[in-house]
């Protein structure tokens, strides 16, 4: 048999447990106004009601006072608001940052691709390096760049594939608006010796 449970409008506990909420006075007023029959059942209408009332009032006074209770509620709201603001700032930081994919020539026809700027998005760089190594069948490692930030270095000319994978990875995390910048840095050829040209 299903039974309907009534919850207090002040403390959100069932009325039988209102005494543990620290808001007993207000809970009793709410209960007497909204559910008089339940109030009579719990707190009685006998002669000893006044005694029970006196004891419960003492208990209510000894628990947290109303002013202090309101202060605690305000502090809780402030903390929640700070948390929301922090989350918004982090999201804005993620959206304003950019991922840089840079291709550099090593020797002759050998290239490396360096990906930086992913640490902002809480992506595990070592896992990503392992994924790239198995996906492209190349050597891949995580190293620190000149700015002391982690970057993934992939051996081989796989810039286009990496770019599409990074786009799909960011979309998966719900960050479609993040800029992915590609830089193609080729080594400058050394000029021939002037004496040999003449």
Curated annotation (Swiss-Prot):
One Pfam family from the record: DENR_N
Domain SUI1: 99-170
Broad class of where this protein is predominantly found: cytoplasm
Keyword presence, Transit peptide: no
Localization in the cell: Cytoplasm
Keywords, sorted A to Z: Cytoplasm, Ribonucleoprotein, Ribosomal protein
Keyword check for Cytoplasm: yes
GO MF annotation list: RNA binding; translation initiation factor activity
Gene Ontology biological process terms in this record: formation of translation preinitiation complex; nuclear-transcribed mRNA catabolic process, nonsense-mediated decay; ribosome disassembly; translation reinitiation
InterPro entries: DENR/SUI1_TIF, DENR_C, DENR_eukaryotes, DENR_N, SUI1, SUI1_dom_sf
Cited CDD domains: DENR_C
Any one Gene Ontology cellular component term annotated for this protein: cytoplasm
Quaternary organization: Interacts with the 40S ribosomal subunit.
Family: Belongs to the DENR family.
PANTHER family xrefs: DENSITY-REGULATED PROTEIN, DENSITY-REGULATED PROTEIN HOMOLOG
Domain notes: The SUI1 domain may be involved in RNA binding.
Miscellaneous note of the record: Present with 21600 molecules/cell in log phase SD medium.
The protein, known as: Translation machinery-associated protein 22
